[in-house]
């Protein structure tokens, strides 16, 4: 099947990664997607519903490769017990950057599509931005008795009813971090907490489902 899509430059990513990339937005009103239209870009991304096999086949015929599967989940917000988390401060940024860089080294920004250090740098910047309140609105952390950070979660208000987890990581701290996220959303009057993760991250999927989340959608990321 032919694919109709607009092509939009990924301005922030291009500046951050030093690449010339764009994303296709599939819509019936857009022109036909052709190799000539894709040629000016060194990297083109596409995100499609996993159930849409027609688009998947058509994009692969245009030279796109499957990079990653994504699962989006949602859970109802309830008032749960306090986890003891605190708001991260700017003095926590160096440690958080190091932790996020290591935890998220194998995202869709990995080699060979991007530089070997690109994924780590991207998520280090993400968690720093969360501490500063840009993009994600806040970062909360759990501390060990030593004072070291043993877990962190970044969160963002989407609208009057929904909040979304950005990054969540901490070995053995998943349940506490979910408590933290639910408390944060509850305090802001939200009714739904959303989170996305890689299809292959079964540990995260189990944690979210154990915390009450249901799968809302699945998608594939493809690159050319």
Curated annotation (Swiss-Prot):
Its EC number is 2.3.1.210. One of its GO terms (molecular function) is N-acetyltransferase activity. Disulfide bonds: none annotated. Pathway: Bacterial outer membrane biogenesis; enterobacterial common antigen biosynthesis. CDD domains: NAT_SF. InterPro entries: AcTrfase_WecD (IPR012752), Acyl_CoA_acyltransferase (IPR016181), Ankyrin_rpt (IPR002110), Bact_Acetyltransf (IPR050832), GNAT_dom (IPR000182). The keyword Transcription regulation does not apply. It holds the Pfam family Acetyltransf_1. It comes from the Bacteria. It catalyses: dTDP-4-amino-4,6-dideoxy-alpha-D-galactose + acetyl-CoA = dTDP-4-acetamido-4,6-dideoxy-alpha-D-galactose + CoA + H(+). The active site is at 208 (proton donor). PANTHER family: AMINOALKYLPHOSPHONATE N-ACETYLTRANSFERASE-RELATED, AMINOALKYLPHOSPHONATE N-ACETYLTRANSFERASE-RELATED-RELATED. Belongs to the WecD family. This is dTDP-fucosamine acetyltransferase. It comes from Escherichia coli O6:H1 (strain CFT073 / ATCC 700928 / UPEC).
């Amino acid at each position: 099947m032919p694919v109709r899509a607009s092509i939009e430059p990924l301005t922030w990513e291009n500046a951050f990664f030093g690449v010339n990339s764009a994303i296709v937005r599939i819509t019936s009103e857009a022109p036909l997607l052709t190799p000539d239209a894709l040629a000016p870009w060194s990297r083109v991304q596409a995100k499609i519903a996993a159930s849409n096999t027609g688009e998947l086949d058509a994009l692969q015929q245009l030279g796109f490769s499957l990079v990653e599967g994504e699962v989006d989940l949602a859970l109802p917000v309830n008032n749960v017990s306090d986890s003891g988390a605190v708001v991260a401060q700017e003095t926590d940024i160096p440690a958080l950057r190091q932790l996020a860089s290591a935890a998220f080294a194998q995202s869709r920004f990995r080699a060979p599509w991007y530089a070997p250090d690109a994924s780590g740098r991207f998520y280090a910047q993400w968690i720093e931005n969360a501490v500063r309140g840009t993009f994600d609105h806040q970062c909360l952390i759990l501390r060990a008795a030593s004072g070291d950070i043993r877990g962190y979660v970044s969160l963002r208000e989407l609208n009057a009813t929904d909040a979304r987890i950005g990054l969540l990581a901490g070995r053995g701290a998943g349940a506490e971090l979910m408590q933290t996220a639910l408390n944060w959303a509850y305090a802001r009057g939200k009714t739904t907490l959303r989170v996305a993760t890689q299809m292959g991250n079964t540990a995260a999927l189990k944690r979210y489902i154990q915390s009450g989340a249901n799968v809302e959608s699945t998608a594939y990321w493809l690159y050319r």
